[in-house]
Amino acid sequence: YCPWEMQASIMQSGHFKVVHDDVDPKDVDADYVFDCRGKPDDYSEYEDLTNPINACILGKPKWNTSRNPWSRHVATPDGWTFVIPTHYKSPSHDFCVGYCYNSDITQQEVAEYNFLERFDVDVAKHVKFKNYIAKNPIVDDRIFLNGNRLFFLEPLESSSTQTYIMWVDFIMKYVLNGKDTTSNASKKVRMYIEQVKNFVLWHYQCGSKYDTPFWDYAKSLTFKDDAFDAMLYESRSYDKHGIMPKSYGGYTTDGNEYGQWSPYSFKVWDQGMKEVLTDKMAMV
């Protein structure tokens, strides 16, 4: 989907009153406020999320990406590139190919050269960003941060949207109904995002076919999390049938997830990295 088109559809739906203004959420006369104003200007109330990517070159493809029904994630010497299937009439089309890299390791000019060498695109935009999480996801017990106001993590795994949905669902079911406190809710969403961060970091641990400074750095970003280790151990304890949730005829517990991922997701990724990718790299 195109974020801009989706936003326009919601805003024009007529299901609620829309007022365009630049206000401080604390001044909004409402019981509860969802603050989705995007990335903050001041990061003093935020903490860094460990990740090897901090920049991206967005490109307009010279081929029809919509022919492929799934997104591509392509390893490069400087990081990785996403290719999102997008219709040429979509507002997102000019930015649907992105060369993700680390600007502290690779100069922008070098990254752009490598991008154009590997992909048939016109460079549309250069962006740099921080990976971060809010220290306090809930302000004054009534202002709920969400979207890029809550956190930002590089696009590998496209984890952001699901996190936003999970957070709203949790708030509606537990906080607004008085089943949980705002303090505990803040701890839970921060833990959830930490798990998302770790799962994304795991993607880099086996490296790629490129022996470069970026991949050396990316592989060095290890983490320690007992919950992650337990999920990985569980995923290795079942075959491809038993790993399915009980509701689908398997043996694992329904709703047992680390961040957004079940034991099945762990098993698929673990086997892909340790068996398929490692074998292919040995042949290079």
Identify the role of each PLM range.
Residues 1, 32, 43-46, 70, ...:
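Sequence-level detector for tyrosine residue identity
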Residues 2, 21-25, 151, 185, ...:
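Short, solvent-exposed coil/turn linker segments
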Residues 3-120:
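Predominantly flavin-linked oxidoreductase catalytic cores and closely associated redox partners
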Residues 6, 10, 32, 80, ...:
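Tryptophan-centric aromatic hotspots in well-structured domains and transmembrane helices
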Residues 14, 29, 120, 152, ...:
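Short, flexible coil/linker elements and helix-boundary hinge sites characteristic
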Residues 87-89, 101-207:
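FAD/FMN-dependent oxidoreductases across multiple families
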Residues 177-284:
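Long, low-complexity C-terminal extensions of enzymes
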